Each structure stands twice: as structure tokens, then as C-alpha cells.
């Protein structure tokens, strides 16, 4: 079954926007604050953002086969993570612009340990969005624990900023 990419394009545009906004918010944090870890989350803010961006890049590589997304830089700075995420945004736009078969099986091999996975395109794409939402939420929790208000990165705020959503507050 071939999927329409239009719905996916909006979802992935939000994914890239939200991740980039969160990275931008963390650029103002000190090195000590970036090492903040909250119980129940993946780990320190910086490590979680690196993990999120690198996995996003890896998923693009697995799905597209484009070696430009075959990077592994676990020491990347936040500025480098931001650049990588912007590059991912271009990659997702290009990937989603072609006809996609949600049932096409994609084979993944982990270079570090040989782990292999076969999964349909539809599941891989859903996992990218789920993974991003989960880790952005964890970083927002850690930022909040520092007494800092995290950026508003929900879908409706994205839509408002992109001019795709209009809201009207009733008269009080």
C-alpha cells in the first residue's frame, strides 16, 4: 500500500522544528546544567539530545540509503547537533516526497554489534516520531527540574507559528 506523504510531511516538519527549538533552548544552559539527569529519563540532557539527533540521522540512513546520514559522533556539541538536525530536516523532506510503500521491509544492521532488524517503512516512520516525542519530553522534564521553562514545542504551537492553525479566544 502506497502512503500519501502530505500527512507525514507535516508530522516530520513538526518533529524537526520541535527538536531544533529544544536544542536552541539548551544552548543557553551551562555545562553543569547540560549534565542534569532526572530519574525516569534516558540520562543527562546533552546525552539525550545527542542520542535523539544521532538516531534520527541513523533512521534516515537506514530508510534512504544515503551515506550522508551515516554519521556517528557521540561527542557532538549542541551546535553540531543543531546543524545535523537541520540537515535531517532536508533529508526527511526529500525522503517523504517520493512514493512510499508502508509495507516495504527495511533491513537495519547495527555496525557496533551486528544487531539486525527487519521492519516495514510505516513502522520505522512511526518509531522516528515516537522516539523524538519521548526524548524531547524527557529533556523538557530535566529542564523544568532546573527551574527553567522549556520551549513550547507541541504540534499546535508549531502550527500556529507556521500559519497553519488559527485560534480564537472567546471574549471574557
Place the predicted regions along the sequence by residue.
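SAM-dependent methyltransferase
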Residues: 105-111
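Short, contiguous alpha-helical
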Residues: 9-72, 112-172
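Short, Lys/Arg-enriched N-terminal segments with co-localized hydrophobic residues
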Residues: 1-2
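Helix-adjacent hinge/juxtasegments
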Residues: 65-105
Amino acid at each position: 500500500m502506497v502512503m500519501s506523504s502530505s500527512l507525514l510531511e507535516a508530522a516530520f516538519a513538526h518533529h524537526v522544528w520541535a527538536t531544533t527549538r529544544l536544542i536552541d533552548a539548551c544552548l543557553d544552559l551551562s555545562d553543569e546544567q547540560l549534565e542534569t539527569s532526572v530519574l525516569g529519563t534516558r540520562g543527562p540532557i546533552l546525552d539525550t539530545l545527542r542520542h535523539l539527533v544521532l538516531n534520527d540521522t541513523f533512521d534516515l540512513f537506514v530508510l534512504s540509503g544515503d551515506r550522508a546520514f551515516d554519521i556517528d559522533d557521540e561527542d557532538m556539541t549542541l551546535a553540531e547537533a543543531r546543524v545535523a538536525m537541520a540537515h535531517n530536516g532536508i533529508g526527511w523532506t526529500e525522503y517523504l516526497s517520493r512514493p512510499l510503500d508502508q509495507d516495504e521491509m527495511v533491513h537495519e544492521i547495527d555496525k557496533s554489534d551486528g544487531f539486525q532488524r527487519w521492519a516495514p517503512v510505516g513502522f520505522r516512520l512511526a518509531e522516528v516520531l515516537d522516539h523524538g516525542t519521548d526524548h524531547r519530553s524527557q529533556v523538557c522534564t530535566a529542564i523544568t527540574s532546573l527551574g527553567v521553562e522549556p520551549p513550547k514545542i507541541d504540534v499546535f504551537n508549531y502550527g500556529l507559528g507556521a500559519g497553519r492553525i488559527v485560534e480564537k479566544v472567546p471574549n471574557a
